[in-house]
Amino acid sequence: MIQVASKILVTCALPYANGSLHLGHMLEHIQADIWVRYQRIRGKQVYFICADDAHGTPIMLKAKQSGITPEAMINKINQEHQTDLAQFEISYDNYYSTHSDENRELVISIYNTLKENGLIKKRMISQLYDPIHNIFLPDRFVKGYCPRCKLPDQYGDNCEICGATYHPTDLIDPKSTLSGVTPVISKSKHLFFDLPVFSEVLRAWTRSGALQEQVANKMQEWFDMGLQQWDISRDAPYFGFEVPDTPGKYFYVWLDAPIGYIGAFKNLCNKRNDIIFDEFWHLSSKADLYHFIGKDITYFHGIFWPAILEGSKLRKPTNLFVHGYVTINGAKMSKSRGTLIKASTYLAHLDASYLRYYYATKLSSDINDIDLNFNDFVNRVNADIINKVINLAARNASFIQKYFDNKLSATIEDQYLYDYFVTASVSIGEAFNNRETSRAIREIMILADRANVYIHKKEPWVVAKNKYYQQDLHNICSMGINLFRLLMTYLQPVLPNLAIQAEAFLNTKLNWDSMVIPLTNHKISPFKTLLQRITLSQVKAMIDATH
């Protein structure tokens, strides 16, 4: 059971500002949002922040290719990202950018602190340089033969076939992906963060028991291999923050990106007067700090980032919540197969609630990959949300409206069943709190099945035919509406927009603390369709639009 402080700062990994969000990105934002919404519902003071990762060579080159400035491009992308996230009902308190005054000041301040503490080293390195474009080539802008397995077409940092990691200069027959020419080797003096100094601090943090077992085991592998000094500088031309008193040198994006968490929170504090910055980032902070991230960036967040914080005399994360990748119909996302689906393309064809629910049925606290199978997606959403939950309200509301002027009865027909549903809040709440979202959904759907069995056995459509059993009909259907209310209370973190519609129908707020008291002698609103069924033709249209 995760013990959560009363004050919490939650972040998602920063989307890179050179392209659109896709359904892979949305997994993390939805997972974090469900957890954040649950914590808020249970009375925690939560601040949920994110930002665009807006620096680096890829952004500089793409902007140049598009004939615009990097600033213009990242501003456009930022607006697009914020629109997509809002339509997916992601409840950020602040969504910002790493290209900000707050972040620049923080990066320079942290760098100066590290430098004063003797943690910044200088040394000469050899780099690959494109003589056509006059640019030092980042790892992902050079390809060649893997130095270990000798297979071709591998990037400059690691082999996707054998898993080897290496320096770009180790590639056999390297070629620039920009010009296709063989790059030349050029020397340059770079700045390095003395990461090995923090080996024991990081080992202790890893052994604290807070991290997922798979994550802790992976970090132990890195410790066993030995930590290396970290190159935190890049040569001009580069889009980012220039290193003070070092002309032509810029901070590497992976230094200023995680500091962007602090920058985004600082910006939120500047916009409000009710948040004390030091309560969340000071070394003595009693607040919790959680980073939701994908498993591909565990090294940066589990090794590099806490070391930077330790060296800067700032607090370390309480925990990293790491998730796996999204596959589509069992395979990696692919542009050619039409499965690298943009968030905006999805939203043009389908309601955000569908994906929020489907991801929730798959999410757990481990780092296994999650498959978005479209046949299962359609069947699961229709069976669970439409058939079991919404139809429960629709069937009973029709009788309440027709015979009882939309007013619920004065008594609960089955108090034992109602209490059983309320008692389930303990286990369901524990599952949400521990990020075992799929378990929470399973338990909620077991309740939904039981509610529908209750209605099926009571047969209100038969009872309605006998005018002498009007009170029974009233009690049965009022019970059905009350069970719907409890189901929607539990689903509120997963389906916030549907929950708002349910509140309008029920004419009351959904509240975990007050649900022990049923709705009796209570006027509800006329029932309106809350959500439509999905069809495979809608999914096909979405995929066709992706090609």
From Swiss-Prot:
GO terms for cellular component: cytosol. Gene3D superfamilies: HUPs, Isoleucyl-tRNA Synthetase, Domain 1, Methionyl-tRNA synthetase, Zn-domain. It catalyses: tRNA(Met) + L-methionine + ATP = L-methionyl-tRNA(Met) + AMP + diphosphate. One of its GO terms (biological process) is methionyl-tRNA aminoacylation. It is found in: Cytoplasm. SUPFAM superfamilies: Anticodon-binding domain of a subclass of class I aminoacyl-tRNA synthetases (SSF47323), Methionyl-tRNA synthetase (MetRS), Zn-domain (SSF57770), Nucleotidylyl transferase (SSF52374). It is an enzyme of class 6 (ligase). InterPro entries: aa-tRNA-synth_I_CS, Anticodon_Met, Met-tRNA_ligase_1, Met-tRNA_synth, Methionyl/Leucyl_tRNA_Synth, MetRS_core, MetRS_Zn, Rossmann-like_a/b/a_fold. Its main location: cytoplasm. Zn(2+) binds at C146, C149, C159, C162. A motif ('KMSKS' region) lies at residues 332-336. Its cofactor is Zn(2+). CDD domains: Anticodon_Ia_Met (cd07957), MetRS_core (cd00814). ATP binds at K335. Binds 1 zinc ion per subunit. A motif ('HIGH' region) lies at residues 15-25. PANTHER family: METHIONINE--TRNA LIGASE, METHIONINE--TRNA LIGASE, CYTOPLASMIC. Monomer. Belongs to the class-I aminoacyl-tRNA synthetase family. MetG type 1 subfamily. This is Methionine--tRNA ligase. It comes from Baumannia cicadellinicola subsp. Homalodisca coagulata.
